[in-house]
Regions:
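Phosphate/pyrophosphate-binding catalytic cores of soluble transferases and nucleic-acid-acting enzymes
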Residues: 1-314
Length: 314
C-alpha cells in the first residue's frame, strides 16, 4: 500500500496559467504533446458551448491535436460554479492518473477555478433561484456598477480581487452575502486539500506592451471571425450571468443603442463616463480596453502566489 502511494505521489499536474492573450493554449498543447497528456481546461468561460469566438476557445486543429476536457462541456443556461468544477476536475484527474498518465496538463486563466482545484473550497450554498432572478433583473436594469457598490459595502475584501466588470462574478458574490449573512471572501479557498499527486504552477508572462498588442490584435481577429454574429445569436440568453463578461456585454450595449435602448451601464462597458456604445468601432475599443484591464487584474491576483514559477513566453 505504501509503495502504491509513493508511486502516485510521483505523478504531477502541471497548471499553465497567465493573463488573457499571453499564449497559454499553444504552450499547454506543446507540453501535452510532450507528456502524452490531455489538456484539462480551467477557464470559467470556455466551459460554455454557446461561447466560442469571444472566449478564444482552441481552434479545430488544436482540439484535434490534443484531447481537451471542460471545453464546451456545459450550457450557458446552467449554473456552473467553481465548487462544481473542483469536484469534477478532481474526479477527472483521479481517473486519468489511474489510467497510467504520469503528468497531466491543466490550462486556464480563471484564478478562482485554479484555487478551487488546488486548495479546495468551503461549501458554498446552492443558488437561491428567486434571489438570483431578482439580482439578474437588477443587473440588467441598474448595471453591474450598482451591484458592485452593494457588494463593496458588504464585503470590501472581495472587491479587491473580483473582476468588478464581470456581472457573473459580482452577482454570485452578492448572492452569497445576502443568502448567508457572511462575506463571500470568508468562503475563499484555504490550503487544506491534500493531494495524491504533485502540483506545479507555471505562469506565463510577456512584456506589457507586447501583451497588450496581442490582446488588441486578438480582439480584431475575433471580430473578423464573427463575434458580432455569435453575440447576436445569444440575445435570447443575454440574462444569463455567464454573458455579463468582456467581449459580449460591449456588443450587447451596441445592439441596445441600435434598438433605441441607450444605456451607459448594465449591458455596456460598465465604467462611468463610457457613454452609450453608438458604433461597432466603439464596442471594439471597449473590448480591447476591458480585456487589457482584465489581464492586469489577473496578474495582480497571481503575484501573491509564491508557488508560481514565472516563464517569459516569447
Amino acid at each position: 500500500m505504501g509503495n502504491h502511494f509513493d508511486k502516485v505521489r510521483l505523478k504531477k499536474v502541471e497548471i499553465i496559467l497567465g493573463p488573457t492573450g499571453v499564449g497559454k493554449t499553444e504552450f499547454a498543447i506543446k507540453k501535452a504533446l510532450e507528456y502524452g497528456s490531455p489538456v484539462i481546461s480551467c477557464d470559467s468561460r470556455q466551459i460554455f458551448k454557446e461561447m466560442t469566438i469571444g472566449t478564444a476557445v482552441p481552434d479545430a486543429s488544436q482540439l484535434a491535436a490534443v484531447k481537451h476536457y471542460f471545453i464546451h462541456s456545459n450550457s450557458v443556461g446552467e449554473d456552473y460554479t467553481a465548487g462544481r468544477y473542483e469536484i469534477e476536475a478532481h474526479r477527472l484527474v483521479k481517473e486519468l492518473l489511474e489510467m497510467g498518465h504520469e503528468r497531466l496538463v491543466m490550462c486556464g486563466g480563471s484564478g478562482f477555478y485554479i484555487d478551487a482545484f488546488v486548495n479546495g473550497l468551503d461549501d458554498f450554498p446552492p443558488a437561491d433561484q428567486k434571489l438570483r432572478a431578482e439580482l439578474t433583473a437588477r443587473l440588467r436594469e441598474e448595471g453591474v456598477g450598482a451591484l458592485a457598490e452593494e457588494l463593496r459595502a458588504l464585503d470590501p475584501e472581495s472587491c479587491e480581487v473580483i473582476d468588478l466588470s464581470n456581472g457573473q462574478r459580482v452577482l454570485r458574490a452578492l448572492e452569497v452575502c445576502l443568502m448567508t449573512g457572511r462575506k463571500f471572501s470568508s468562503f475563499k479557498t484555504s490550503p487544506k486539500r491534500s493531494h495524491d499527486f504533485r502540483i506545479e504552477k507555471i505562469g506565463l508572462m510577456r512584456p506589457k506592451e507586447k501583451l497588450y498588442s496581442r490582446i488588441d490584435a486578438r480582439v480584431l481577429k475575433m471580430i473578423d471571425e464573427g463575434l458580432v454574429e455569435e453575440v447576436r445569436g445569444l440575445i435570447p440568453l443575454r440574462d444569463r450571468p455567464a454573458l455579463q463578461t468582456v467581449g459580449y456585454k460591449e456588443i450587447f450595449a451596441w445592439f441596445d443603442y441600435l434598438d433605441g435602448k441607450v444605456s451607459t451601464e448594465g449591458w455596456g462597458p460598465t465604467s462611468p463616463g463610457d457613454g452609450p456604445v453608438t458604433t461597432l468601432e466603439r464596442a471594439i475599443e471597449l473590448i480591447q480596453r476591458n480585456s487589457r484591464r482584465y489581464a492586469k487584474r489577473q496578474l495582480s491576483y497571481w503575484r501573491r502566489d509564491k508557488s508560481i514559477v514565472w516563464v517569459e513566453n516569447i
